[in-house]
């Protein structure tokens, strides 16, 4: 957890999107002008499980993400800097 607005908030300690190339905004994982850490949608079943592979076409080596967190958000993702329900 990390503090925000005087309250401990779970997940904030993971940090922001991985953006080593200083891309200007969030976007689709296959877009060269998006954060390198932007990933595609993950489909999860009602019981909370998923067996779908997560494809990250711009990540080439596991060492690139070693020591990093993977954050999965509930709900849809419009691949925007201003998230909105789908």
UniProtKB/Swiss-Prot annotation:
Signal peptide positions on this chain: none
Binding-site residues, Zn(2+)? 17, 26, 35, 38
Q: Keyword Oxidoreductase: yes or no? A: yes
Mostly located where? Answer: periplasm
In this chain, Cu cation is annotated as bound at: 17, 73
Which UniProt key words apply to this protein?
A: Antioxidant, Copper, Metal-binding, Oxidoreductase, Periplasm, Zinc
Protein name per UniProt: Superoxide dismutase [Cu-Zn]
Q: Name one Pfam family in it.
A: Sod_Cu
The taxonomic lineage of its organism, from the top, reads:
Bacteria, Pseudomonadati, Pseudomonadota, Gammaproteobacteria, Pasteurellales
Annotated compartments: Periplasm
- Report the superkingdom from the record: Bacteria
Family that this chain belongs to: Belongs to the Cu-Zn superoxide dismutase family.
Q: Where is the composition biased (Low complexity)?
A: 7-16
Q: What does the record say about how the cofactor binds?
A: Binds 1 copper ion per subunit. Binds 1 zinc ion per subunit.
**Molecular functions per Gene Ontology:** metal ion binding; superoxide dismutase activity
Q: Name the reaction it catalyses.
A: 2 superoxide + 2 H(+) = H2O2 + O2
Q: What does this protein do?
A: Destroys radicals which are normally produced within the cells and which are toxic to biological systems.
Gene3D superfamilies in the record: Superoxide dismutase, copper/zinc binding domain
Q: In the Enzyme Commission scheme, what number(s) does this protein have?
A: 1.15.1.1
Subunit: Homodimer.
Write down the species.
Mannheimia haemolytica
What cofactor does its activity depend on? Cu cation; Zn(2+)
